[in-house]
Amino acid sequence: MDHIRNFSIIAHIDHGKSTLADRIIQVCGGLAAREMEAQVLDSMDIERERGITIKAQTAALSYRARDGKVYNLNLIDTPGHVDFSYEVSRSLSACEGALLVVDASQGVEAQTVANCYTAIELGVEVVPVLNKIDLPAANPENAIEEIEDVIGIDATDATRCSAKTGLGVEDVLEALIAKVPPPKGDPAAPLQALIIDSWFDNYVGVVMLVRIVNGTLRPKDKIKMMATGAQYPVEHVGVFTPKSRNLESLSAGQVGFIIAGIKELTAAKVGDTVTHVAKPATEPLPGFKEVKPQVFAGLYPVEANQYDALRESLEKLKLNDASLQYEPEVSQALGFGFRCGFLGLLHMEIVQERLEREFDMDLITTAPTVVYEVVQSDGSTIMVENPAKMPEPGRIAEVREPIVTVNLYMPQDYVGSVITLCEQKRGSQINMQYHGRQVQLTYEIPMAEIVLDFFDRLKSVSRGYASMDYEFKEYRSSDVVKVDMLINGDKVDALSIIVHRSQSQYRGREVAAKMREIIPRQMYDVAIQAAIGAHIVARENIKALRKNVLAKCYGGDITRKKKLLEKQKEGKKRMKQVGSVEIPQEAFLAILRVEDK
């Protein structure tokens, strides 16, 4: 066991995590030269295109060190984005060490810090590495200062490398072997294996990626999940080198996969502990929690007959993404669809993109909302994730909204504009620290404000230099109201929004004005109103299209003209009673684009 090293790589987006992983796999000879491709471990198309890692992957590699010994290195690739922070913490708790990759030209950024703190809390040895030192803009001294300043770990002897050219990659591996401790654990003890990730394979069912902490696992053993109590016979065990390779057994300290003929992904939850049925472990490994969705949105098919296809697509996606939740819902305006829960905005975009790309769906998405805690006047508490389910104002005692703690990092030139943005978003400043040229701001901001367009606005006010990460803090009482949109006196449920009272009038006016531009003119007047409860806060009118009925009427008596006009008026009135206004798809997106002034 002294020759095993389990490690993962922590980095901000675009600091070269996947490229470094590619190089390490190449140096260790994990794949032949013809099988190498960029970002070997990112298996989804979206991961490649966006250059992000979503699911954790592993590679078991053997490396002959300069001291002549052969070491088994287990690389566990982690996602770097805040939406997937639970997956990151599970991947990290399976390691003894982590390579902290920092772009020498950019310095430390928000997600690096967030994941690095997670690693330090879990007691993982962090080994700093400066990447991209071949760039003319690289400034390694500055980056080292920032690492020591912001994160507070000693980085004087940080290894320097360039993952693109392969320069210094072996030094990184040597530093890893020297600094990271070998795994502890007893191969003879009762089995405890941590599920790092799980995904669905069309041929063998669910594949679980595990780190064996104690004990030994062989095919034909009976295992059980400690969170659910379900039992399964093991069919295969093995490792990925990144290709899968079956082994006779997996024992303490190793990272590999288990295939046990499990049919649904919900049975193999990330963070759960696997143990033997015959000789079970007394307690599960710490840190398991159910992941709760933070952001909700309605997904509807554009064609009503696509509903079943959408349901099948969601079921298939759910096989590979246990954190996605959905339930059927009906909207008067959009017909049948699903209310889906996501971990965050990036997660939502990815699910939408995968539905459109892999399953060829045409979707309408409603505005994303967060979950509110509503205390009703009879004392009961309900969770509202859909504006349409918000009780009437008279039945609400108080509404609590989710507050998140946001950490922002930016060069000091942009502090002013970022603070202004946070203030607009009803944020309250908790802390502000200067680290050399970088500034760290900590704010508490309502999650609802972040969901809309905070990230895009942050990037635009800071010219792309600011980076952020956020985590849920608590529910806090707040004065939020539901704004309904009425078209000719009828509520359109899919257009309801929940906003803070201070912005409700303004948002109502803006949405009404937007709708006026978007809804085509009808044969009769259309009134668009925004209402809070029974109180109308804004109104816009769309004038009717009308035919000039007097065109053929020359001279003669005025009563002749009056008669024609009256007749037209009657017709319009009748039309208005039976007609319904078609609301185009853009109207639902318009709500998203209403800027907060």
Swiss-Prot record:
Q: Which PROSITE patterns match?
A: G_TR_1, G_TR_2
Q: Per UniProt, which keywords does this protein have?
A: Cell inner membrane, Cell membrane, GTP-binding, Hydrolase, Membrane, Nucleotide-binding, Protein biosynthesis
Biological process, per Gene Ontology? positive regulation of translation
What InterPro entries does the record point to?
A: EF-4, EFG_III/V, EFG_V-like, EFTu-like_2, G_TR_CS, LepA_C_sf, LepA_CTD, LepA_IV
Q: Which Pfam families match?
A: EFG_C, GTP_EFTU, GTP_EFTU_D2, LepA_C
Name its cellular compartments.
Cell inner membrane
Q: Which GO terms describe its cellular component?
A: plasma membrane
GO terms (molecular function) for this protein are: GTP binding; GTPase activity; guanosine tetraphosphate binding; ribosome binding; translation elongation factor activity
Q: Which top-level enzyme class is recorded in the Swiss-Prot or TrEMBL entry?
A: hydrolase
For this protein, the Enzyme Commission number is 3.6.5.n1
Ranges for domain tr-type G come to: 2-184
Membrane topology of this protein: Peripheral membrane protein
Tell me the CDD domains matching this sequence: EF4_II (cd03699), EF4_III (cd16260), LepA (cd01890), lepA_C (cd03709)
* Chief place of localization: membrane
Q: Which PANTHER family match?
A: TRANSLATION FACTOR GUF1 HOMOLOG, CHLOROPLASTIC (PTHR43512:SF4), TRANSLATION FACTOR GUF1-RELATED (PTHR43512)
Q: What is this protein called?
A: Elongation factor 4
